[in-house]
């Protein structure tokens, strides 16, 4: 699914109107019918409904929804905010239709002072004040109205976006002046702001409603950001040949683990094997030998000369891919070995965990790295790598894109909607995964998965795409049996077979 900017959304509406053809008013009616159906699926007509409509087209949608709900037997009270006496043309027409229909319990057009209605538990608020066209924080009376709605016990459903939330960058927005919806009914496509963790408090559940905007425009229009879906991943997967053997399925090298962190090398190695690679060689300190040999008998072990740390670079000529970093430690000897390893590496590489922390502490080394590496930081690791001081998710995403460009590589920023930032500036969000995966070792599993895919011959971008989707899908399948609270990292590896089977259906 492509994610369009607010300007592109406007052009999509315009193109649909001109080429379907359909009037803007009839397109608004189509959207209102989809919105009404979605509301009626959630709330019965015994639920009192209060609609707050703004002066623009989002308000026009809300007025049309109010009319349709009232026709279906809902008790609807409507408040249209028209303080500047300037409604959009379609909003004005829907105001006229609503009044002429005489079905709503109450219609109030607010032009000066406003005495807000009592909002109570058991009521439904339809928020249609502002949509994706908003480009500045709410202030004054609208901000006060938002605060009043948020303080109520009523359920809130927002049309397209919660009022006050902008469709893209909210780094300078005012949190108190944004509606906190229980359900957001967004039209045609998700917006970029919906992919940011710090905006989830406003969105509630999200439903995307298909209002049949031009498929031709959507297909031919480039978007910087998109969401990876199951159909996209199915198209990328290569069938395993009947005559495949371990030599043809790739050999992966994992450099992982230090004293006390053998578990990281176990997790990465098991995940790598479960992702179908022909052979895995794990380079780890001597102290980890027995743990690794017992925990992962399928792996080939290569022991470092040191007892407790990674200290010597490995010749990668015989390997098809390398993953480095899980549980590695950050000693000075390991840091020196790491940069030497990355400089001499001749195969595709995944850089994770302590390897990222070492690079963050030696930023000058980052300019010496080969191109097309895949970096897999969680948010705090990215902050250290990129020198970010703000915790704003949008700024973090932009910095990840800048870093991908500067390093000529891929930044896979892990999170609920993991974001794959390409060196050309494109961003792909993952649609799988859940909060149960927020547990130690989950990233080590991801490193193993992507390393295996690289070793099997997938290009860097495809390995990262498939890897993060598989990782999240395994987590989604696992919580169906185990729940979120008890999920641990090794469960993700255990559910990889089911994830593959799902994609092969």
Residue ranges and their predicted role:
Residues 64-150, 290-302, 311-314:
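N-terminal small/polar loop signature for handling phosphorylated ligands or for N-terminal nucleophile
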Residues 112-113, 161-167, 192, 307-309, ...:
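Short acidic loop-to-helix transition motifs that present clustered carboxylates
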């Amino acid at each position: 699914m492509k994610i369009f900017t607010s300007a592109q959304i406007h052009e999509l509406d315009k193109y649909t109107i001109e080429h379907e053809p359909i009037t803007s008013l009839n397109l608004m009616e189509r959207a209102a019918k989809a919105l009404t159906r979605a509301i009626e699926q959630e709330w019965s007509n015994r639920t009192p409904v209060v609609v707050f409509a703004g002066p623009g087209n989002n308000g026009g949608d809300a007025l049309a929804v109010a009319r349709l709900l009232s026709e279906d037997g809902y008790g609807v009270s409507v408040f249209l905010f028209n303080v500047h006496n300037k409604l959009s043309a379609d909003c004005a027409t829907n105001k006229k239709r609503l009044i002429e229909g005489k079905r709503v319990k109450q219609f109030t057009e607010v032009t000066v002072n406003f005495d807000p209605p009592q909002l109570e538990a058991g009521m439904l608020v339809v928020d249609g004040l502002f949509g994706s066209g908003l480009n500045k924080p709410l202030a004054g009376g609208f901000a006060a109205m938002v605060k009043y709605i948020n303080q109520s016990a009523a359920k809130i459903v927002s049309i397209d976006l919660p009022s006050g939330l902008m469709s893209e960058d909210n780094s300078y927005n005012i949190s108190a002046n944004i509606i906190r919806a229980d359900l957001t009914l967004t039209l045609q496509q998700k917006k970029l702001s919906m992919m940011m963790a710090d905006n989830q408090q406003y969105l509630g559940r999200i439903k995307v409603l298909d209002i049949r905007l031009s498929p031709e425009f959507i297909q031919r229009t480039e978007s910087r950001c998109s969401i990876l879906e199951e159909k996209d991943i199915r198209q990328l997967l290569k069938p395993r040949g009947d005559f495949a053997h371990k030599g043809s399925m790739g050999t992966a090298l994992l450099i992982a683990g230090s004293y006390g962190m053998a578990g990281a090398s176990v997790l990465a190695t098991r995940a790598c094997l479960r992702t179908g690679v022909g052979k895995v060689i794990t380079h780890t300190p001597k102290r980890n030998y027995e743990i690794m040999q017992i925990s992962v008998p399928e792996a080939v072990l290569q022991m470092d000369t040191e007892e407790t740390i990674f200290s010597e670079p490995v010749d990668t000529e015989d390997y098809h891919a390398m993953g480095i970093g899980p549980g590695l430690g950050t000693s000075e000897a390991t840091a020196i070995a790491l940069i030497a390893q990355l400089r001499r590496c001749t195969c595709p590489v995944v850089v994770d965990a302590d390897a990222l922390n070492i690079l963050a502490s030696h930023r000058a080394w980052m300019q010496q790295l080969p191109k097309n590496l895949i970096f897999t930081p969680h948010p705090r690791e990215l902050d250290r790598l990129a020198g970010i001081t703000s915790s704003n998710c949008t700024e973090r995403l932009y910095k990840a894109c800048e870093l991908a460009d500067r390093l000529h590589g891929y930044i896979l920023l892990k999170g609920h909607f993991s974001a794959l930032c390409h060196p050309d500036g494109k961003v792909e969000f993952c649609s799988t995964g859940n909060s149960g995966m927020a547990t130690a070792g989950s990233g080590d599993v991801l490193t193993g998965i992507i390393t295996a895919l690289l070793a099997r011959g997938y290009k860097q971008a495809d390995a990262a795409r498939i890897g993060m989707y598989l990782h999240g899908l395994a987590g989604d399948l696992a919580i169906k049996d185990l729940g979120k609270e008890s999920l641990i990292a090794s469960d993700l590896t255990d559910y990889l077979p089911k994830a593959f089977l799902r994609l092969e259906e």
